[in-house]
Amino acid sequence: MPKPCPNSTVSSHFGLNRESSALAPSSGYLIVEANGGLNQQRSAICNAVAVAGLLNAVLVIPRFEFHAIWKDSSNFGDIYDEDHFISSLEGYVKIVRDVPDEIMTRFSYNVSSIPTIRVQAWATVNYYNGEVYPVLKEHGVIRITPFANRLAMSVPPYIQLLRCIANYKALKFSSPISTLAEKLVDRMVEKSSATGGKYVSVHLRFEEDMVAFSCCLYEGGRAEKSEMDVIRQKSWKGKFKRRDRVIRPDLNRVNGKCPLTPLEVGMMLRGMGFDNNTSIYLASGRIYQPEKHLAPLQEMFPRLYTKESLATPEELAPFQGYSSRMAALDYTVSLLSEVFVTTQGGNFPHFLMGHRRFLFGGHAKTVIPDKPKLVLLLQDMEMRWEVFKKEMKLMLGESDRKGVMVPRVRKINRKTSIYTYPLPECECIFHLSSNFSNTGNILSLGALHPSSNLISSARL
């Protein structure tokens, strides 16, 4: 059973009384601007809550920056339930929707006139206390932008506690998102009757922009190379044409840096033992050249579904053009899957793996392929299927070990983020007050728990 949060963590460091939810007088208002996609913004929000607690500041509901890549103009309230966010953090960090008029009048109601601080990446607690706090006390309000990765992973336990509460209790998806997500989960369970309602989710990063960014080639010859060059220039300007930038698609592939194709994912899963009765939810944006690349995966796994195939056009219409809202649907359906398969790095799989570890006490089945090894195996045209299956079984065993691993003694760093490895630091929040009786953005779990076996003898 998880240990309760120490009394000193709550009372001494936050100066609060949970009976009255009273906090000590604040040192000012904190405004942050979160950039990136859904989970980079999620990271920024959790870090903002932690920084506000550290500085004893009032946090203004974070603003979301519009990015040319993500093309999503959503505000905080479009993605998350603002009321739930505010009430869940009551007594820990005060949250407001706007800076009060008496302060904004000093800056002619112009947010850009508020003192702006450019905080270094992975800033320490000492940095915030020495460099940021004095400015906040002097002006009563500060703005930090950008705010991606602006707080070190290694912080005192009472700051980690705030990250845990923000991530797993306070951030609940908005009603439109959670309502449709619940329908999608129900439909996946219904379509997975052959496996007792259990399904596999695959996060497939084979969208056009991801293929372009990876600088990898996929048998498309000169036409594909020219197409990718145009996309890179349009989206990232001259980033890939700098003199010090050497593009080596062959080395990228051997080093496991290329996104796996749908065919490669299918071969891997069949080799691991997932048969053609397995229901698969594909969490992805629009696949690059879908007619060409999705067909092999569909043939190997006829029970292949996406949010587009599970929802009606009318249900998806309010989400079209909003990549973060679409990603939130994928996140929730993947969160409740029996097995989660990640095929590329990024914030989505790291946050999702952490969330599943938190929900299921560290025991969440995950497939994390050894991509350099997988590439070598797939390139061996003389390898027999039985040999390939044996190698995939070994890879699956290693993935399962990593998936259920709960590091007890470890040094927290960027690679062992609390968002990916939330235990044991976040374990105690199960014992906080009744304010936290539900799990925020989690739907009713019902019988969905990563325990039963979906793997059988695969036959191609």
Swiss-Prot record:
Glycans are attached at N7, N110, N276, N277, N435. Pfam families: O-FucT. Substrate binds at H203, L204, R205. Keywords: Carbohydrate metabolism, Fucose metabolism, Glycoprotein, Glycosyltransferase, Transferase. GO terms for biological process: fucose metabolic process. Pathway: Glycan metabolism. Belongs to the glycosyltransferase GT106 family. This is O-fucosyltransferase 10. The lineage of its organism: Eukaryota, Viridiplantae, Streptophyta, Embryophyta, Tracheophyta.
